[in-house]
Each structure stands twice: as C-alpha cells, then as structure tokens.
Amino acid sequence: MDFNREHKINFLYVLAAMVGVLLIQSLVSQPDHIRTIPYSEFQQLASQGKVTDLVVGPTRITGTLKDAPKDSPRHFSTLRVDQALAQSLTNENVTFSGEPEPGPWPTILGWLMPIVGFALVWMFLIRPMSMGPGMDGMMSIGKSKARVYVEKDIKVTFADVAGVDEAKDELKEVVSFLRDPRSYGRLGARVPKGVLLVGPPGTGKTLLARAVAGEAGVAFFSISGSEFVEMFVGVGAARVRDLFEQARKHAPAIVFIDELDSLGRARGSAFPGGGGHDEKEQTLNQLLAELDGFDTSIGVVLLAATNRPEILDPALLRAGRFDRQVLVDRPDKKGRAQILEVHLKKIALAPGVPVDDIAALTPGFSGADLANLVNEAAILATRRHAENVSLDDFTQAIERIVAGLEKRNRLLNAHEREVVAHHEMGHALVAMTLPGVDMVQKISIIPHGIAALGYTIQRPTEERFLMDRAELMNRMAVLLGGRAAERLIFADVSTGAADDLAKASAIARSMVVRFGMDPTLGQVAYEPETTSALGLPNGSEWRPRQYGEQTAAAIDAAVRELIETASACAFSILQANRGLLESAARDLLAKETMSGEELQALLSQLGGGAASASVLRDGGDGAADAGQDRSGEHRALTVEGGEAQ
C-alpha cells in the first residue's frame, strides 16, 4: 500500500474542511444589525442630538440611534476623521466613551480556535474510526487486516522447526522458488499457486509458514480467515482484493491465511436444506477469482493452514488453486525427540536427562503439547527451588497434563478410598495379564482434575496404526476391569466406572457398525465416520440412519454381547487373582501412588490370562485402522479413572 499517497489524501480532506470552517466563520462574524454610515451623516445626527452610547476608537466610532425607524438597524458605525470630535460632542451634550484599538491577538485567536477545534475532533474521533483497532476502521473497512512482517522481522527458520521433516522438504521447494522465481520456468515447470498445510491443532503449521518466509527472506502477510468477513456486505471480497494487491506490491512475498476453513467452507453447507451464508460465499468467490488470476512468476506464494480439510470447497482444492497439500501430522517418537531438543535449549536441564525417554513417555503429543510440557516441567522445578530441571519434573508434568491437577483437598471417606483403590488396581491387573495391551506406567488414588478420583496411566511400547479384533476386545476388558473389581470385592458397582463404560461402549459400537467385526451382522459399515481424516470430530450435521428397526435391534444386541464378553474376561482374571488384587489394593491405599516398576513386581504372581485371552479371540477376526478409529491416536497415553459424581 502507498502510505505517502494515503496520508496526502487525508491531508487534503483536512485542508478542505479547514477552509470551509474559515469561510463559515467569516460569514458569521459579519454582523447584519450594524449600519455603516458616512462621517458627515454622523456629524449631522450628532448635532441634532439623535445619537447616544457612542464608543470612540482610534479609527472607528460605533453607537446607537435614538429614534431609528422600525425597519432600520438602531446601531451604526462610521470611520473617525475628525480629531476635534471630543470637543464637538461635549458642546452638543452627547455621551460618549473611548476604547483602545484591540491588538492582533483577538483576531488571530478568532481564526485559530475553529482550526484547533476541528483538529481535535479529527484526532480523537475521525482518525480512530479510520485507523484504530478498537473501532475496526469504519473509513478503512474494505482494507485488508493482514499483518505485514518485512524480511528483518522474521527470525524463524527451518532450524526452529523439528519433527516434520517431510513437510519441511516439501516447503524447501517454495523457498527456492522465492529466491529465484525464473529458474522454475527454464524447463516449463510451474510452481503451485497455493500450498495448503493440513494437520491437527498444535502441529506447527503456522510456524512452518513463518519459517518459509524467514528462510526466503521475503515479506510475510499473515491473516486469519475469520478476519475477512464483517457485518457489512461486500467487505470480505474487498479485503481479499486489497490483500492480493498489497502482496503484489511487496513481491516477492508470502501470503498466509490461517484457519482457512472459516473462509473456504463448502458453499451451500450452512444449512442442511441448502442456501448458505451469502457474504461468506461472496468472499470465497473473490478468493477463487484472485487465485485464477494469480501470476506466480511475480514471486508471490499463497500458503494456508487448516485442521478441517474435509469441509473445504472442492473448487478451492482443485488443480491450479490450492493444488498441493502438505500433511503436518503429530510427530512420531523420533520427531518428538527432535522437537524436545529444540525446546530444551531454552531451559536449565539437569545433566544426563535422556531425551529419548521423555519422547517415549509422550505418545500422541503434538509440537505445542511438547512445548507446554517443557514449560510445565520448568515451572515445577522452579517451584521446588531446584538448580535445574530433572526427569522427575517431566514425569510430574506429564501427569498434570494427562490426568489434571492433584486435588488433595477433595477428601474421600474410608469406604470410597477402598472402592477407588480396588477399581484402579483392577484396571492395572487386567492390563498386565492380557497380551498386546499397553504397559501400565502408574496408578494413583489421589483425586485429579475435575472429576477423576484416581487414575491408571498406560504407555504404549511402540507406534501402532492398526488394531485387530483381539486387541480391541482386550482394550475393552481393561476399561471394564475397574468395574469388575468393584463387583468382585463389594458385590456392587459404583458411579465411578461411568466414563470407562462409555469408552468401552464406543469401541464395541465401532466394531459392529464401522469395522464389520460382528459375524452375525457381517462386513457392512452401517454408520459413517465420526471423525475426520485427522482424527478430529468432523462436526457434520446429523444424518438419518440407513438401516431399519430390526437391524438397529441386532446392532444393539451385538454391542451388548461384546461388552458382556469383555466384562466376563476381566471378571475371570480378577477372580483368579483375588488375593493379589486385595493385597495390591492395600498397598495402594498405604502409598496412594504406585509406579510401573512396583507393579512389574506383581507380574510373576498373576495367572489366568491365557484362558481369558482365548475367550476374547472367539467370535471372528479382523483389523481396525487405529489411524481412522482414533480410539487411541498413535496409541497415545491411556488414562482410566474413577469418576466423581
């Protein structure tokens, strides 16, 4: 944008307004109730005694006529030309007075005060409306709100981005194009007009876009998709045009649109019956038009980020617009270690802390989660006045993030503590008995978070993306282990297993209606995906079911049978190890927390797992895609806990 031209236009507006104010003042300042008369007429009136209340100045005389006509002004003014006037007035017995001629300041102030007043009005009212962030710019409402970062402002490079090597390799091509746009036309190649960064929240999409600008050393325009649309019709389209115009003037440059899904949602999807948001659609149409007329040879690249690619308009993703999609997924163990290396440089780390062990303890964590973990660990170390951050600080920080804050002021009575201890130990013993189940890392009966009265944390031993039928059944058995322990020891169940039961029911229903793992209903997908390709809730509108009442009853029966089978498995394991369950629960009551090493000492005393595992394998086979099921994203840390009511 030409800022000098904009300021020049504003100055012309102010100058024109000032001239108008001065003209109005000059017209108003000329009184129409004073009549100017010749000095000879004044002498004649004075000699006849028809004037009074004279004010005699060095150059002008003003006064009042005694008997003025009704349609004529009573006040008069004349220029003084007679130096012997005072003597003449005295001889005629006319009252008069003298007044010194005013200096130049009253006249100057009379002209300046309107100017100053208008300037103050412009500074405090008009200018904030056009420029201030608080009132969103009524005079610049059609201007883009993109924040511009010039080359020296971008301090982020690819060295600051870790754990997403594949995405960095894709974007390095964009950097080389920005450095030398003409080289890509040598063999007829065309650089993609738009690059769409797709990934779950917190994986570093915005950081990658800034790193591209930092590596290329070009201007970086950053704007959110929600900033285009306002309450006025046509504003969004105007801002899209202005954004691309600014980018062309600052070329080479990068235009980054964050949260593209708020702008590029599929047209006609605002209501199930059709229609849509006309203003958003108009803004999207303008964006599509700009992308069609976008000449990449000028050195401008459009980047965008979203975590909901499935709701974007197909016209936006076609070849020639956003024709390249770069997946920025949650990092694996190696990627997490690389991300931790970047963030650990900012804190005082104790010597000998194994980064790989921390990475192994954080499956499913995104880059933002890991940054938060390092900060939480540093806060915990500061709280205990330590010289540096130890591995124990990271372990406690993981527990705070996964299970929530400790609530030691939430006091339980003796019976409730026993129920919670047996509940959590039931989870742990079933998990340690069944094969292929994530290793138990820690159990606790200290209340955490909003509702958890205790928790059991499991940590996967490896990255997994597929789960077969037996593994899903084992997972349900672990979830129902706490409820089975309550039924075995106390001959009753409590409300603390409500969350476990809901999770087990969700797995069982997915096995029946999505994975086709029920032999009676067959290999049919009765319900669509409930999560997006990135493992997030797709937020789609309600869809009517595609099956009848008889099939619905069969589905309910199959789900119930799977849950009952898993519950029976957990109960049989705990019944075979009842003595161990009771003794381990007593230890847990005394210690309140038990680590994975302490639990491993109980492993040699366990029995009854093989028979129970064979029961779970009966009834069919199959595999579930954990990447699509997302019942455990990348086999993330699993937490089972009693729920407070």
Curated annotation (Swiss-Prot):
Its EC number is 3.4.24.-. It holds the Pfam family AAA_lid_3. It is a multi-pass membrane protein. Its main location: membrane. It is found in: Cell inner membrane. ATP binds at residues 199-206. It comes from the Bacteria. Residues 1-8, 127-645 are cytoplasmic. Gene3D superfamilies: 1.10.8.60, 3.30.720.210, P-loop containing nucleotide triphosphate hydrolases, Peptidase M41. NCBIfam families: FtsH_fam (TIGR01241). This is ATP-dependent zinc metalloprotease FtsH. The gene is ftsH.
